[in-house]
Every structure is written in C-alpha cells, then in structure tokens.
Amino acid sequence: MNYTFPFGEPIMAVKQKADSYDKKYFILGVYASAVHVQWIKDGKVIVKALAVASEPEIFWKGDDNYVQEVINRINLDKSYGELKPASRSLNGPSGNCLDERYLNPLKLTRNDVWLCDLLPESRKNPTQEKALKEHYDGKVFIDYNFPPVPEIIADDNRVCEIVQELEQSGASNIILLGDQPIKFFLNKFDTTYKKLADIEAKNMYGKAFPVTINGNHYSVICLAHPRQTGELGQHSPKWKSVHDKWIEAL
C-alpha cells in the first residue's frame, strides 16, 4: 500500500546509508519523524507544524533549505493558503538531541554509529490527527493516506530486517532508545527487562549487559528516547533527570 502525507508527498522508508560496515554502535529508535511546515491561511497560522514529507536522512537535524525544497515541490494552490518552514526547533529536534545528549557524551560521531528505527516510515501522531481533522479533512481536496502509529510497531518480519541491519553494521554494541525497542526488539531475544523502568529499577540505566542475537554476542545499553531527555513534546521530567545523571557519571 502506498502511503502519502497531507498535500500528497509519498511516505518513504528512511534508513541508514550504508557508508561503512565497521560501526561501533547500532542505535535503535522507534519510528521515523517528518519534515514539518507552518500552514498559513488568510494571514493566520492555522497549523504551526504539519508533517508533509519524509526526512532526508534518519535522525535528521533539520535544514530550512531542505524544508523550502519540499514546499516548492508541493507547490500549494494559493486557495489553500501558503506553507513556510516550521520553527527550527520543530524540524530535527530528535536528531540534534541524539548528537548533543547521546553521541557527544560517548565521544561518538555519526560516522561511528548505524542508526535504525523499529518503523522506518513516518506515522501520524495524535497532534497531527487533531490538526488534520480541524483544518484539512473536507476542506483540502488533495488526498492523503497517513496511517497512525500501529499497535505492533515491529512485527517478526521487521525484526528480521533489523537484525540484518545490525549484522550489516558490524557493530558489537547496541543502544536502545525508550520502551518500544525493548518491547518489540530486545524481548525477542532476552526477556529480562520489559521496559525502561525495569532497567532503571535495577540501577542498569546506561549500563551494558550481554545479549545473544542470531548466535552473535552484543553489549546492550538502554536509554530514554530523545523525546524524553530533550523535553520534546510530551515527556516525563524523570527521564531527563536520570539521563542527566548518566551523562555526569561518564
């Protein structure tokens, strides 16, 4: 099935570019984010951050020039208003947080890691759904097929694909970001921990433990998702504090 964003851009799988196969860490997130625009009509901002295109790279750090390229490509009919780049803080925040609060403290660069998501495509979150119902549906006659986050984020076939990427990366260390990679990936191979709170309760936040996957041995570290540690949207102050202490202890 072909999925599309509002205003018609295709939803693409966003995956790591296979630039080398000797990475130090394999980092697994949840699902791909998107390029966001500001939607203005009759001089008023009606949606400050509408997802309209797939990011150009996994854990993208934002780029107004690229956002403008997307806007030019959409070429919105003026009867629907106009699109402008969303605030810089709303494009690529997870990617910037990943660099600043995960890679930098570990003295890693993007060249040292292989990035992956349980679901490599963007999905509609409740905020996007609300905005579309209020301002798009029945008012803009450009079809879209933007599915919500599924109950099962990664099925068995997707887990197999992730394992293939893991082996391709050459990494022997794995970082899992948040509850979902524990639930949908780690628990296929090790059921010691069910969620990040279990990790933290055992004083294992940010500490490596061994896991065997497909006969290969890895060191796994579980950390909170950048949404939590970077205070991006809905988040729990607890995980920022826990993550801050982890950084201080490195």
Regions found by a protein language model. Give the residues of each.
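Proline-aspartate-enriched helix->loop->beta-strand connector
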Residues: 162-182
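Short, well-ordered beta-to-alpha junction loops that form the rim of enzyme active sites
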Residues: 30-32, 118, 176-181
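Active-site and ligand/interface coordination hotspots across diverse enzymes
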Residues: 1-104, 161-165, 209-216, 242-250
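C-terminal capping/extension of enzyme domains
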Residues: 1-9, 45-58, 82-83, 128-160, ...
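Short, surface-exposed acidic-centric catalytic microdomains
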Residues: 59-67, 88-142
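Hydrophobic/aromatic beta-strand patches that form the interior of the parallel beta-sheet core
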Residues: 26-28, 114-116, 173-175, 219-221
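Feature marks short, surface-exposed loop/turn motifs that line or immediately flank catalytic pockets
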Residues: 34, 122, 230
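A structural signal for well-ordered alpha-helical segments within the folded catalytic domains
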Residues: 92-96, 179, 183-184
